[in-house]
Amino acid sequence: MSNKRNRPVKNTPGGAFLFPRKPASALPFPRGCGMLTGERMIHMAKLYFKYGAMGSSKSAQALITKFNYEELGMRVWLIKPSVDTRDGKSVIRSRIGLHQQADAVPPEADLCALYRGMEKTDVIIADECQFFTPEQIDQLRTLVDEDNVPVLCFGLRTDFLTHLFPGSARLFEVADSITEIKTVCACGAKAIVNARIDGQGRVVTAGEQVFLGGNDAYIAMCHRCWKKAVREHKTVRRP
């Protein structure tokens, strides 16, 4: 018979369970999750990267994760790159209607300095991480290692030409945990391409890597459908 008092109360994004507060000697000790020093359990923080194509509910998962941590009484620092202004400079908004205020971080900002100069939080959640600079990703890695604060990053893997974003590339190199958030193409296959569509419904194959203005839209497509649309100059239904 299971002991209800010892049941986990939440499943965190990293796959670990959060248990009710108890004496350190009574806490479980999962392999690789922490270390014992005397009578204290010190949980070792990790850097998580959850990536997916457009429309895979990355922002929704980021905001739901924030809610879950706060429901447990934990303090969350919610951040996004300042270059992402689609929904407002300091707002994270999901397609399902969830939205939250977030700190917009400019590319020249030092995330270590920002974090260490504010009231300490229990976790950092970062959305649209593909737009962070590689140096800022390294700063998040430093906060995990030196300040023992978990960092959960959400973002795209590749741009509209299937090339890695610099921030995402660095996350693939230094993250402890990497998880794909899957979505599907209109044909039903797995979508991996973030296709850029112009005002006439044509797939764009040239331009700046980061372009958030104008009449262009983005949709998730499988590689086969994307290549066919490019080759045959097919019109794609815009979202």
Language model features with spans:
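Conserved P-loop
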Residues: 42-115, 159-170, 180-183, 212-238
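Short, positively charged and aromatic/hydrophobic N-terminal segments
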Residues: 27, 35-40
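Positively charged N-terminal leader segments that act as targeting/secretion signals
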Residues: 5-23, 29-32
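Sensor-1/coupling segment of RecA-like P-loop NTPase cores
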Residues: 144-166
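Short recognition patches in nucleic-acid-associated and regulatory proteins
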Residues: 184-211
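Walker B catalytic acidic pair
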Residues: 128
